[in-house]
Amino acid sequence: MILTKAQYDEIAQCLVSVPPTRQSLRKLKQRFPSQSQATLLSIFSQEYQKHIKRTHAKHHTSEAIESYYQRYLNGVVKNGAAPVLLDLANEVDYAPSLMARLILERFLQEHEETPPSKSIINSMLRDPSQIPDGVLANQVYQCIVNDCCYGPLVDCIKHAIGHEHEVLLRDLLLEKNLSFLDEDQLRAKGYDKTPDFILQVPVAVEGHIIHWIESKASFGDECSHHAYLHDQFWSYWNRFGPGLVIYWYGFIQELDCNRERGILLKACFPTNIVTLCHSIA
């Protein structure tokens, strides 16, 4: 789904100060029924992550952490089964999984002889049954499963979706009888920064030569696209020549402005591929 900047801004404006909940996403879908669920979820997640980055510091002051911890302790004393941490995260407008991490770190600092390592914290967040306090384990679990944008569950889902779309792209390339090298093959050849697929025989798409294709299982907004241009796409262009980026969940139309310079954007696999007869050196 390709959106104009104005269409994107309208959706983003609706996300100001809404909690990262499934209920919020359902309301967004009702407000924009013509947009796909996947596109809205991607925009929803990206906008919320921008918000968290802007407000992250205020939640990490020693005063804030101590206040949250005492509120957690008071809450579970009254009712340990109630979603105390989840409600607290929503009240102070902080991602539930990140709130769970804060409280878990504070709890372990108080109850363990040595400060907990990052790997231990991550392991406990992935598997809350490892947390030595049953009440806190349940509170952390509630935060993890109810967070739409952060946490180990979301990370696993994003990784799986990304892999799924890479497999889809591979199948489409094979279906078109296009020869290619994938990321693993390129790294075996010594390349450190590579696109998902290098075409061994270049193709033309809408009059533009394509040497490589990158799959992105997300929506291409200004922030993410400019970061990708800087960190990935221009490096690919410099090393391998012009290429194609597929944002499977759409992108802002105005961002497709580098076609003449060698980076083409699409929201699906192109159907009008013309195979060229010479191969990459």
Curated annotation (Swiss-Prot):
The modification Phosphothreonine is found at T114. Changing Y247C: In CDAN1B; uncertain significance. GO terms for cellular component: cytoplasm; nucleus. One of its GO terms (biological process) is erythrocyte differentiation. It is found in: Nucleus; Cytoplasm. Keywords: Congenital dyserythropoietic anemia, Cytoplasm, Disease variant, Hereditary hemolytic anemia, Nucleus, Phosphoprotein. It comes from the Eukaryota. InterPro entries: CDIN1. Changing I273T: In CDAN1B; uncertain significance. This is CDAN1-interacting nuclease 1. Pfam families: TPD (PF14811). It is linked to Anemia, congenital dyserythropoietic, 1B: An autosomal recessive blood disorder characterized by morphological abnormalities of erythroblasts, ineffective erythropoiesis, macrocytic anemia and secondary hemochromatosis. It is occasionally associated with bone abnormalities, especially of the hands and feet (acrodysostosis), nail hypoplasia, and scoliosis. Its main location: nucleus. Plays a role in erythroid cell differentiation.
